[in-house]
Amino acid sequence: KALALKPDSAVAFYNMGNVLKERGKLEEAIEAYNKALVFNPDYADAHNNIGNVLQDQSKLEDAISAFKKALSLKPNCAEAYCNIGNAFAAQGNLEEAIIAYRKSLSINPDSVVAHSHMAAVFADQGKLEEAIEAYSKALAINPDYGDAHNGLSFALLNVGELKRGLDEYEWRWKSTKYISSKRHFSQPLWDGQKSLKNKKILLWCEQGVGDTINWASCLPLVTSQAKHCIVECQEKLVPLLSRSFPNVEVKPENRSLDTERNDFDSPLPMGSLYRSFASEVSRKAKADAFLFPDPVRINFWRNRLISMGKGPYVGISWKSANMSAKRLPNYASTSDLSPVLTLPGVTFINLQYVDFADDLSKIQNELGVTVHHFDDLDHYNDLLEVAALCAALDIIVSTTSAVPFISAGVGTLTKFASWKQSPWSNNLFNPVGPSVDKFERNTWQSWHNVFHLIAEDILKLSDDWSHQ
């Protein structure tokens, strides 16, 4: 209507761009902002929002140019400084990001977003105390800011403050990242304190397959108290968890009737189990295996491995199904794996479940190493059988994916290659147990040293086994 009344209105086109952006129509939003600039070339807010859209499209250089144009027209625009900081951070230019956030905060010291985003960059740099301080400043301004609570929880967990970190993690449902995945029941959540005697509890998965497996290690603690335990999880996990926890009712996740259900007394998201059993979780590093694939299938895979040649038999995985920009530093290339792959006298087995064919060919062509792949195994969906294969292997080498959680769960020796500055570099989100050895790299380091150390470990184990 505004454009019909005044078709040369820069403000009207700008507002239209904002509406289109909110609706996810990014190209149309840029077109509307550009029309606003036709009528007012010095419209700093339009340049700023073009930058936001370009960043949403992962066009970071173009976004930075748009933010710089906005700042040239409006030098005291705290929002544009914060936005360009976000773009620098997405590029990995962390120092530039910090400079931009500090400039934003010098103009608007009460920006919870700038404090929170700067804290996240501090965490990526491994400056966890600075991250905790920045998150705390954001929360002093707005105590209900869910994103800051969520980020603070990761920082606290990563410095070993388990109790406080787990308390903060309960705020995740007010974070923009998690709010849409929250389930809504008429029954109140279990608070972790009230007795579960003669009570039925529903535990529901909330994140990835690996997280569900990791948190399932707490199920014996629940079943020792509750009359009945229902677990709703990813459908492909149902066979593995049902076999491993026969006294738990394991079902595929179903959200269709949440507010009408009456088959339990209290629900709880699985990510809250560690908080409910904090003292027991602190001893988890010494816990036994908790996943139990079929022994007949373990023997099948062991015999199949033996038929392929001499051991040790080493499974490898180097990336995830989710390779978003934020997660990329968690993952390695096949070239990074070369210190392990060139070990003599080792039979390598592929445990990668997505996008592996080209990588296996590259390993064969560049290193002359065969990584055996079982075409008859659905690595992505048949997790009960994958667990049996993992249990048959001698060693598993993996970055962050479902694989090290399965291998840790079945008790196979696991060499876990981890990005130290990852928000998830803690016991809540990492595989732990007596069979897990963690090898960390810093943001500013390559993976080479990590896989070199893993290779040395495997070589020593191979020597020990041969002597035995």
Residue ranges, per PLM feature:
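Alpha-helical solenoid repeat scaffolds of the TPR/TPR-like class and their adjacent stem/linker regions
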Residues: K1-I396, T400-Q468
